[in-house]
C-alpha cells in the first residue's frame, strides 16, 4: 500500500494553517483508538493529521494543548498538563530557550497502567529578558510560562538647537 508523504515545508497557498500558534495532535500519553492504527487517506489534506484528533469526545479536545502568544506587552506559553502534579513538572531557561519537562512514573488508571513523559522547548523572543520569566499552574492543570516584553523606545522627537553667545572652546593663554 502506498502512502503519500507531504513535506511540511511545502505550503499550499490556501491551506488554513500557514503559521499556527498551537501545536496540533498533542495527546500526551492518551490511549490509542482503534482507528489510530489504520492508514488513512491523505487526498484531502497536504499534511498528515490523525483524523481522530478532531473526532474525539469534546472532553479530549484540549488535552495536551500548547499555545504560544506574543502580545504587545508580554510573551506567554500555555500548556495543558492536567495529567501531571506540580512535583512532576520542571520549567528551565537555558539561554534563549524555555524548556518544559513533565514525567510521571507508571501508575494504575481505569484502563490499566500508564506512564507519561513530554519535553517542550520554546524560543524566547529577543525583546524578553530570560531573567523575568515566571511560571504558574492553574487549578485546572494549565501551566502558564510568561515574561514581560521590553518596552520599545518612545516615538522620535526633534531636539531644538539653541544658540549660545560664548564660545565652547577658549584659547589657552600663551606662554
UniProtKB/Swiss-Prot annotation:
Classification via InterPro entries: A-crystallin/Hsp20_dom, ACD_alphaB-crystallin, Alpha-crystallin/HSP_16, Alpha-crystallin/sHSP_animal, Alpha-crystallin_N, HSP20-like_chaperone
Modified residues (N6-acetyllysine): 92, 166
Molecular function (Gene Ontology), one example: protein homodimerization activity
Tissue expression remark: Lens as well as other tissues.
All residue ranges annotated as the sHSP domain in the record: 56-164
GO terms of biological process kind: apoptotic process involved in morphogenesis; cellular response to gamma radiation; lens development in camera-type eye; muscle organ development; negative regulation of amyloid fibril formation; negative regulation of apoptotic process; negative regulation of DNA-templated transcription; negative regulation of gene expression
Localization per record: Cytoplasm; Nucleus; Secreted; Lysosome
One annotated Gene Ontology cellular component of this protein: plasma membrane
Binding residues annotated for Zn(2+) 2, in chain numbering: 104, 106
Sugar-bearing residue positions: 41, 170
Binding annotation for Zn(2+) 1: 83, 111, 119
Stretches the record annotates as Disordered: 142-175
Keyword Isomerase belongs to the record: no
Phosphoserine found at: 19, 45, 59
Disulfide bridges in this chain: none
UniProt keyword list: Acetylation, Chaperone, Cytoplasm, Eye lens protein, Glycoprotein, Lysosome, Metal-binding, Methylation, Nucleus, Phosphoprotein, Secreted, Zinc
Residues with N-acetylmethionine modification: 1
Pfam families in the cross-refs: Crystallin (PF00525), HSP20 (PF00011)
Gene3D superfamilies recorded: 2.60.40.790
Summary of the function given for this chain in its UniProt record: May contribute to the transparency and refractive index of the lens. Has chaperone-like activity, preventing aggregation of various proteins under a wide range of stress conditions. In lens epithelial cells, stabilizes the ATP6V1A protein, preventing its degradation by the proteasome.
Assembly and interaction partners: Heteromer composed of three CRYAA and one CRYAB subunits. Aggregates with homologous proteins, including the small heat shock protein HSPB1, to form large heteromeric complexes. Inter-subunit bridging via zinc ions enhances stability, which is crucial as there is no protein turn over in the lens. Interacts with HSPBAP1 and TTN/titin. Interacts with TMEM109; in the cellular response to DNA damage. Interacts with DES; binds rapidly during early stages of DES filament assembly and a reduced binding seen in the later stages.
Similarity comment text for this entry: Belongs to the small heat shock protein (HSP20) family.
Annotated protein name in UniProt: Alpha-crystallin B chain
Organism the protein comes from: Oryctolagus cuniculus (Rabbit)
Amino acid at each position: 500500500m502506498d502512502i503519500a508523504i507531504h513535506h511540511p515545508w511545502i505550503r499550499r497557498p490556501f491551506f488554513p494553517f500557514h503559521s499556527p500558534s498551537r501545536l496540533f495532535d498533542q495527546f500526551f500519553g492518551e490511549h490509542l483508538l482503534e482507528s489510530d492504527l489504520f492508514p488513512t487517506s491523505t487526498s484531502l489534506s497536504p499534511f498528515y493529521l490523525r483524523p481522530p484528533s478532531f473526532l474525539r469526545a469534546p472532553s479530549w479536545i484540549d488535552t495536551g494543548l500548547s499555545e504560544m502568544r506574543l502580545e504587545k506587552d508580554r510573551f506567554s506559553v500555555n500548556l495543558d498538563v492536567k495529567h501531571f502534579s506540580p512535583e512532576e513538572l520542571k520549567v528551565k531557561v537555558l539561554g534563549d530557550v524555555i524548556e518544559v519537562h513533565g514525567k510521571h512514573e507508571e501508575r494504575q488508571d481505569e484502563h490499566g497502567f500508564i506512564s507519561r513523559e513530554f519535553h517542550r522547548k520554546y524560543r524566547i523572543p529577543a525583546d524578553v529578558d530570560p531573567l523575568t520569566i515566571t511560571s504558574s499552574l492553574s487549578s485546572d492543570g494549565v501551566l502558564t510560562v510568561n515574561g514581560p516584553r521590553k518596552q520599545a523606545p518612545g516615538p522620535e522627537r526633534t531636539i531644538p538647537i539653541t544658540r549660545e553667545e560664548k564660545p565652547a572652546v577658549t584659547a589657552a593663554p600663551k606662554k
